Amino acid sequence: MSLISRLRAVVAGDDYLDGDLDDLVYDDDQPEQDQRASQADGGALATIGDGNPFDLGDNFSGSNVIGMPGISTAAAEVNLMEPRSFDEMPRAIQALRERKTVILNLTMMEPDQAQRAVDFVAGGTFAIDGHQERVGESIFLFAPSCVTVTNTSHDEASTPTVVSRDAEAEQQQEAAAAPSPAWGATAL
């Protein structure tokens, strides 16, 4: 039987469904005694060879799916951190790698160290395709990619827009604007 006719038979299902497999050559180098001994020692694989090769029976009722580390069906965990120095930032990155949400309250840090900490954790968040959000003054939320962050705050949309150009209106607009963080106050 040629290769093309075998392929046609496989596609059509003729020879294999009828049990016409006699023209295939098998090697019977191993004696029958050794086959029985290997089946007795082979465990689950020995029971498969006894019957229909496509019937796995009850031996493989379990699943072969292996879960991802860090993902569980338990409740999600949020870490609230109030670091006092930059040396505590690797803990935030480790929590993100373990698929935990991190809230950083940086009010206890010096402004330059706080900026460095935000940049460091934001880089780690970007590396794992996570999300970052500024929650408040010196408070930031960093979430892994498995967490969806939505912002339903309408504070930004409700800020009035000043149309006039007189100096008094500009001063009122600057006073009403959100204050900049202490670490970002640099003269341009």
Curated annotation (Swiss-Prot):
It comes from the Bacteria. Keywords: Cell cycle, Cell division, Cytoplasm, Septation. The lineage of its organism: Bacteria, Bacillati, Cyanobacteriota, Cyanophyceae, Synechococcales. The keyword rRNA-binding does not apply. The gene is sepF. It comes from Parasynechococcus marenigrum (strain WH8102). GO terms for cellular component: cytoplasm. It is found in: Cytoplasm. Cell division protein that is part of the divisome complex and is recruited early to the Z-ring. Probably stimulates Z-ring formation, perhaps through the cross-linking of FtsZ protofilaments. Its function overlaps with FtsA. GO terms for biological process: division septum assembly; FtsZ-dependent cytokinesis. Residues 152-188 are annotated as: Disordered. Residues 152-162 have a biased composition (Polar residues). Homodimer. Interacts with FtsZ. This is Cell division protein SepF. Its main location: cytoplasm. Belongs to the SepF family.
